Every structure is written in structure tokens, then in C-alpha cells.
Amino acid sequence: MHIFDELKERGLIFQTTDEEALRKALEEGQVSYYTGYDPTADSLHLGHLVAILTSRRLQLAGHKPYALVGGATGLIGDPSFKDAERSLQTKDTVDGWVKSIQGQLSRFLDFENGENKAVMVNNYDWFGSISFIDFLRDIGKYFTVNYMMSKESVKKRIETGISYTEFAYQIMQGYDFFVLNQDHNVTLQIGGSDQWGNMTAGTELLRRKADKTGHVITVPLITDATGKKFGKSEGNAVWLNPEKTSPYEMYQFWMNVMDADAVRFLKIFTFLSLDEIEDIRKQFEAAPHERLAQKVLAREVVTLVHGEEAYKEALNITEQLFAGNIKNLSVKELKQGLRGVPNYQVQADEHNNIVELLVSSGIVNSKRQAREDVQNGAIYVNGDRIQDLDYVLSDADKLENELTVIRRGKKKYFVLTY
């Protein structure tokens, strides 16, 4: 299957410039292309993964990727479809984020092997030395204000106000494309659908300044079946950095995907063949309660992002927590699996009677409720049911001398730390 057709079949093409010309270019030989990532945080997230994996698919088809991390544009801030001006970060902060993102990208693209090995670039390398006068004379003169104002990303900000700094962002992104074309013969840019205006600024600059044709592919912004986006600005980002989103949390994210999204996400986020995905779809639709599509999705993406061992650990944590087998997990695994649950620091002189602790830790509101819960068998300490009102937590209940896990009912977990 032609790589363009595969991308379409997987739902990875939202918009392109000249589809016929782009198809022809991809058929005739190796195409050099780039995707840009602005360092707006110290980690990329699942929203970025769509473009990253699209870039990897093109590399596997024999084309050459350039991964641009925006050390310069990250200092400015992209206004595209944002309601307000971004907060400007210091150069030291942005430089640190650049290094983090470059490290993450190296997990997905092959930077070492073959004539189409990926190349990492930073646009601070060319913007850091250009003077303001040169910027206006050599770049700015190719963009009319009318053209810049016509971009949807700018139109949406005109009424609320947009600074010249952010207004000029599209010129900077356009110049990225121009530089990569001149230095590396890059003729294709890949990015999110919200970047269309900035990306076509690059094709316009190429046409006007160098009389060359550039191509653009935008990938869709991913939403669930209800139309809800996931990403940093929506406050529900699933980060690629395991310190920000653990492999277990990422595993749970995919396991909780709605049935209506599961097969579509298999096409977008995994390298399973379309035939394999079709087989999974048939099995999934025959027995949706078994959640086969979600299980495969969780396995494939967690393994892709964090490695097979992290996937196995996430699966084990899931199975042990579901069964209530707390003692089968290490403290490291428990911290990963119970991140975000209520945590209470037990004081050295605090009475460790179970009823007293249930109240002082905030697990229940009163001693009466605590006594009822214990007597009714609703309280578990490290997976063991406690029904003795006089039970006192001892050192034996401190897992690795660090924490105790309390469960109330079937699913409400609490962690006591010492």
C-alpha cells in the first residue's frame, strides 16, 4: 500500500496542500520532511505522539525525517487557537525543555541507522544570530499584513488582543521551513491541524523567496467520541515522561478508552498492520465486554513509549490491585499504582489503633463510622480484612518500613506514610 494511502486509512491525514503532487513526490524517491515541537513544557504528551508516529511511519517507508525542537519559537509562543497570550519562559528554562524533548524524540525516530536516519535540529541555531533588521528585510517583506491577518489562528485573537510577538510567530515558523529547505532540501512539513496557518506560511515563503514548492500534511487533533480533546491545555494531558505520567497511569488511560474510540486509536497509535487491526475489530465487536481492543491498545502504546518491562509492570500492578493482593507489590510499584490517592503522614507519637487512624487520616468522618466500617468488614490493611476494633497497626504493617495501604470498601484506597 502507498504510504499516503496507509496514512489516510489510519485516519492520520486531516489536510494536505496539493495531494496529487505530494503523492508523486513520495513515489518518485526519498522525501526529506520535518515536524516541529515547541518546548512549552519539559515533556511531550500523547497529543504530540500522533505527529511523531506519523513521522516514524514515513521514515519506515524510506523517507528522511528532521525533528525540529523550537529553542527560538519556544521563547515566543504560538498563538494558534489559544484564548490568551502564553507566559514567556526564560531561555534557561526553554533550553532545559529542549534537551528533555530531544531525548524523548530519540525513542521514536531512528537517528543512527541508514541513509534516511533522522536529524535533530534547533531553530535557535538560525534565529539566535539573525538581526532584527535582517529579519524584517529578508523575511518580513514576503508577508503582507493582509495575508497574516487572514489566518484563522490570528482572527480568533484579534478581538481579545494579540501582541506583535505572537503575531510574528507564523513568520518564524515559515522561515523554519525555508531554512530546512535551503540547507537540507526539506520539502514537506507535518504538524497538527491547528498549525495549518503557520505551516502554509512556510510554503508561501518558499514560493515567493525561492520559487520552490513545499508540501504540508496536517494530522488531526485527537478527540474522543464525545468530542473531548486531550492535551496540556485541556488539563488532562497524558505525558510521555514517566515521572509525570507513570506507565501504570498511561496503561489505565488506554484501558478506559470508550469502545467507540478503541479501534480508531489502534490505527493511529500503534504499528499493528491494518489487517491485524481488522482481526482485532471483529473479535472486539463479537465480545466487547472482554475489552480486547483496549487491552491491545494499552499493551502496544505503553510498550512503545516506555518499553516492555514497564508494560509488564503496569499489567502486574493492575492485576494485583484488582485482586487486592497488596503484599505482592513492591513499594515502588505501589507508589506508581496508587499515585494520586489520598495520602496521610502518620506522626511518630500518633496512636495507631485502627479506629483512631481511620478518623485522624480523614478516611472516615467519625469514630462511629470507623467502628461500623471495621465491624462490617469494609476495612482492609495491606489487603487483609480487619474486623477487630482494638487492632493496632505495628511495624509489620509498614511495607518496606515506608507505607501502609488502607482500602475502604471495594475500590477506595488510602496510603499512610511514616
UniProtKB/Swiss-Prot annotation:
SMART domains: S4 (SM00363). GO terms for biological process: tyrosyl-tRNA aminoacylation. Pfam families: SYY_C-terminal (PF22421), tRNA-synt_1b (PF00579). ATP binds at K232. Residues 352-418 form the S4 RNA-binding domain. A motif ('KMSKS' region) lies at residues 229-233. It catalyses: tRNA(Tyr) + L-tyrosine + ATP = L-tyrosyl-tRNA(Tyr) + AMP + diphosphate + H(+). L-tyrosine binds at Y34, Y169, Q173. Keywords: Aminoacyl-tRNA synthetase, ATP-binding, Cytoplasm, Ligase, Nucleotide-binding, Protein biosynthesis, RNA-binding. A motif ('HIGH' region) lies at residues 39-48. GO terms for cellular component: cytosol. InterPro entries: aa-tRNA-synth_I_CS, aa-tRNA-synth_Ic, Rossmann-like_a/b/a_fold, S4_RNA-bd, S4_RNA-bd_sf, SYY-like_C, Tyr-tRNA-ligase, Tyr-tRNA-ligase_bac-type. CDD domains: S4 (cd00165), TyrRS_core (cd00805). PROSITE patterns: AA_TRNA_LIGASE_I, S4. Its EC number is 6.1.1.1. GO terms for molecular function: ATP binding; RNA binding; tyrosine-tRNA ligase activity. It is found in: Cytoplasm. NCBIfam families: tyrS. HAMAP family: Tyr_tRNA_synth_type1. Homodimer. Belongs to the class-I aminoacyl-tRNA synthetase family. TyrS type 1 subfamily. Catalyzes the attachment of tyrosine to tRNA(Tyr) in a two-step reaction: tyrosine is first activated by ATP to form Tyr-AMP and then transferred to the acceptor end of tRNA(Tyr). This is Tyrosine--tRNA ligase. It comes from Streptococcus pneumoniae (strain Hungary19A-6).
